[in-house]
Regions:
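Residue-identity detector for glycine
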Residues: 1, 19, 34, 64, ...
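The AdoMet/dcAdoMet-binding core of the Class I SAM-like
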Residues: 1-67, 74-80
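C-terminal substrate-binding/active-site "lid" region of AdoMet-derived donor-dependent transferases
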Residues: 7, 54-118
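Short amphipathic alpha-helical surface micro-motifs
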Residues: 28, 36, 90-96, 139-140
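Composition- and surface-driven signal marking solvent-exposed, interaction-prone regions
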Residues: 47-48, 82-83, 124-127
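Soluble small-group transferase modules, centered on the S-adenosyl donor enzyme superfamily
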Residues: 95-169
Length: 169
């Protein structure tokens, strides 16, 4: 995983286990929590609820972000929107970064929640200060795809007591 995802920096800690169980057992705080467990139709509902996102937020630093990778079809954003709406119950700013459709009808979106209230314009301004070539290249690709999450009224919000994911995927 480290080599495939280019996670060779010494300060990156990859945890390959149930994220909720791990967070319940640790006191550590992180700058970034990345979750990659949402490939339809096999969604672990306990990693998609308000309560899970509250637990994750408690383990983020004051400047922290949570980033969740969500599989989707090229035109069905129901799961992306539901996860964004659920994330917005816990995080003041939520963004969606859509990966361009690779041409076979499936794609991914990255849903990002920030502990601090942020503005999309701040991301654009801050990206101009980057010097690492990999980060500069990534931001050039990502910035045009970033949008503020604005789920429609009535979009489901998942909780431990009610997470009808199978109705969304």
């Amino acid at each position: 995983g480290r080599r495939y995802f280019a996670m060779t920096q010494p300060n990156v800690r990859a945890v390959c286990q149930d994220g909720r169980f791990f967070l319940q057992k640790t006191d550590r705080r992180y700058d970034v929590i990345a979750v990659d467990a949402y490939r339809p139709p096999y969604i672990p509902f306990h990693l998609a609820t308000v309560e899970f996102f509250q637990l994750a937020r408690a383990h983020l630093t004051d400047e922290g972000v949570i980033a969740i990778n969500v599989g989707r079809t090229h035109d069905d954003y129901r799961l992306v929107d539901a996860l964004a709406a659920t994330l917005a119950q816990v995080f003041p700013s939520v963004y969606i970064i859509d990966e361009p459709d690779p041409g076979y009808g499936l794609g991914n979106s990255l849903v990002v929640g920030t502990v601090q209230t942020t503005r999309l314009e701040n991301l654009r301004v801050n990206s101009t200060t980057l010097t690492h070539p990999l980060l500069v290249e990534m931001m050039q690709r990502v910035l045009p795809q970033v949008r503020i999450a604005r789920p429609s009224p009535g979009t489901p919000i998942f909780t431990d007591d009610r997470a009808p994911i199978e109705q969304v995927v």
